[in-house]
Design a protein with these regions (language model features):
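Flexible, glycine-rich loop/tail regions that form catalytic "lids" or insertion modules at the edges
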Residues: 1-251
Length: 251
């Protein structure tokens, strides 16, 4: 049983020991596409930028920080499961955790997931572009996260506004399951938020609604302002001996 409200320091100390990135992080920064794979020009540009970030030539952006957090956890013994309607690419095309061969013959073939190829013996990274039902998918991921406390389980809304399609799951399970049934859950909800000009119901994750649901340390509501905060926020969700739902309003 995970101890409640235990905020002991993280047991992992490697990032304080050296300024050089560990091998798995460098491997992910130095992405190599499969031979003969044809990618979109935009994806190529993002990959080239990440290689430059790995060399210290560019500052880390949000997508790189998030992917590096996953890479570090995968090689430290924590499986990562990410699902959502557009999570392979990311709503604002920042993630690109799944790359597609533009010359593929069959639609479901020709995909390459760099986070599955970090090193021998790493844990599984699963990224699922899910069905268009927030309620069904979020409910499933909540159950998965409660049953697998040593896996980082994330659900991403296509836009933060759309999460209200699963409001019953949020109200009755995620924010109150521990108080009602003693069910600990480390589920992460990623809610893209704050982009104007995307049309009606495409710019606000409605932070105020989640703050109204906060009571007695039942959930964590975070609005990171730097890429570094995003990196450590995701790692902390697994490394500290505490399992609380995490709601992240992502840029």
């Amino acid at each position: 049983m995970v101890q409640l409200y235990d905020h002991r320091p993280s047991p992992v100390k490697w990032w304080t020991l050296s300024g050089d990135p560990p091998g798995p992080l460098y491997n992910h920064a130095n992405i190599k596409l499969q031979q003969g794979m044809a990618e979109l020009a935009l994806a190529y540009r993002i990959i080239d930028d990440r290689r430059a970030m790995g060399k210290g030539e560019l500052s880390l952006d949000w997508g790189m920080a998030e992917n590096l957090a996953y890479a570090s956890l995968l090689t430290e013994g924590y499986p990562v499961r990410l699902s959502g309607q557009d999570c392979g690419r990311g709503t604002f095309f920042h993630r690109h955790a799944k790359l597609h061969d533009q010359n593929r013959v069959v639609w479901h073939q020709g995909a390459y997931v760099p986070l599955q190829h970090l090193q021998e013996g790493q844990k599984d990274f699963v990224v699922i572009d899910s069905i268009l039902s927030e309620e069904a998918v979020l409910a499933y991921e909540y159950g998965y996260a409660t049953a697998e406390p040593d896996s980082l389980v994330l659900w991403e809304a296509q836009f933060g506004d759309f999460a209200n399609g699963a409001q019953v799951v949020i109200d009755q399970f995620i924010t109150s399951g521990e108080a009602k049934w003693g069910r600990l859950c480390g589920l992460v909800m990623l809610l893209p938020h704050g982009y104007e000009g995307q049309g009606a119901e495409h710019s606000s994750g409605r932070i105020e609604r989640y703050l109204q649901l906060c009571a007695d340390y039942n959930i964590q509501v975070c609005v990171p302002s730097t890429a570094a905060q995003m990196f450590h926020l995701l790692r902390r969700q697994m490394l500290r001996p505490l399992r609380k739902p995490l709601v992240v309003f992502t840029p």
